[in-house]
Design a protein with these regions (language model features):
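Sequence/structural signature of beta-propeller domains
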Residues: 1-126
Length: 126
């Protein structure tokens, strides 16, 4: 099994599909990008960069110029400064205790919704 491509989260940004991996080995999560979606071809993800989160990534969302990355014990918000390094802009980090958070989505530019696998729903004002 190729653990380097165990995708846990995907998000769409400006015509490109991005994927974040779960980190089984080591501490780094890989960010991959698929620039071209061609139904007649074999599309390949390209490694964009690696980042060390505090835990395994479970979900992500991109909206309002912000990237939300959810792990089992925290939420990371990256403000998109339009540089090549998606994780290089202003960062906000929120720690919490939950059983098994598995999804995140922006409700508006200042609020996200986080959902646990058990169905519990949380709203977080950024």
């Amino acid at each position: 099994m190729n653990y380097s491509m165990d995708v846990e989260a995907v998000f769409w940004k400006e015509g490109e599909l991005f994927a974040l991996t779960k980190r089984f080995r080591g501490r780094e999560t890989n960010l991959f990008k698929l620039s071209k979606l061609d139904s007649e071809a074999n599309n390949e993800f390209q490694l964009v960069q690696k980042i060390d989160f505090d835990d395994e990534v479970t979900a992500a969302d991109y909206a309002f110029g912000k990237l939300a990355v959810l792990t089992y014990k925290s939420l990371w918000i990256f403000n998109d400064d339009e540089t090549v390094d998606m994780f290089d802009g202003e960062i906000s980090h929120y720690e919490f205790e939950a059983d098994q958070v598995e999804s995140v989505t922006f409700i508006d530019s200042e609020t996200v919704m986080i959902v646990e696998e058990s169905g519990e729903i949380y709203r977080l004002k950024l």
